[in-house]
Amino acid sequence: MNRLLQRQLFLENLLVGVNSTFHQM
């Protein structure tokens, strides 16, 4: 359960990072 939550948080952070990079371009 904890591992699943960690992966979800990681995916959300990754998506936010990609969005930030995309907006900076």
UniProtKB/Swiss-Prot annotation:
Its main location: host cell. Belongs to the rotavirus A NSP6 family. This is Non-structural protein 6. InterPro entries: Rotavirus_NSP6. The keyword Iron-sulfur does not apply. It comes from the Viruses. GO terms for cellular component: host cell mitochondrion. It comes from Rotavirus A (isolate RVA/Human/United States/WI61/1983/G9P1A[8]). Pfam families: Rota_NS6 (PF04866). Interacts with NSP2 and NSP5. The keyword Phosphoprotein does not apply.
